[in-house]
């Protein structure tokens, strides 16, 4: 694979692989809802921008995005997402961004490049999403480019993304709603 090209490019190629190849293959073995409100996608670093791009390109499949230390920088043009968000028609997606002030801060060859400042670009994207009226939440920590902070708040991020799910107060309700069971495989 070529991660910078496959994950960081702002086009629909990766989204097509996920929605046209991966999801149908998974649906053969698992009972996956057809409702895009039930579908979330997330990642860290280049995986986070890839996840955002999948939902951006295919909100008919994914409506929730979890981004940890997202690479919304100029690896393959990710730094232009704030402008794309502001210029485009609003899409029906919900986004949770997580990053830290000690993430990669844009030093390149000894000089500062704002387009390669991970934290700055995540904040810019959050501000653009907010200005456009998106359902967006964020957590900024002191972390560097890694999993520690995002892992610590993962339950909070997941609860926020899926906060509008059904809740039963019936004491006799024993229906498991926390996960989906695999479909029965034909014998």
Model region roles, listed by residue range:
Residues 1-187:
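Non-catalytic cap/lid and distal C-terminal segments of serine-dependent acyl enzymes
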């Amino acid at each position: 694979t070529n991660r910078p090209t496959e994950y960081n490019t702002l086009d629909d190629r990766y989204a097509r692989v996920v929605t046209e190849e991966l999801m149908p293959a998974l649906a053969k073995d698992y009972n996956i809802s057809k409702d895009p409100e039930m579908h979330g996608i997330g990642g860290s670093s280049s995986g986070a921008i890839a996840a955002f791009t999948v939902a951006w390109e295919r909100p008919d499949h994914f409506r929730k995005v979890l981004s940890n230390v997202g690479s919304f920088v100029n690896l393959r043009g990710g730094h232009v997402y704030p402008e794309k968000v502001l210029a485009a028609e609003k899409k029906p997606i919900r986004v949770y961004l997580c990053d830290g002030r000690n993430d990669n801060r844009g030093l390149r060859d000894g000089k500062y490049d704002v387009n390669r400042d991970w934290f700055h670009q995540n904040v810019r994207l959050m501000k653009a999403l907010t200005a456009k009226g998106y359902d967006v939440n964020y957590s900024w920590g002191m972390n560097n480019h890694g999993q520690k902070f995002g892992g610590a708040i993962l339950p909070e991020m997941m609860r926020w993304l899926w906060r509008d799910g059904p809740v039963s107060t019936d004491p006799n309700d024993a229906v498991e709603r926390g996960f989906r069971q695999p479909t029965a495989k034909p014998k």
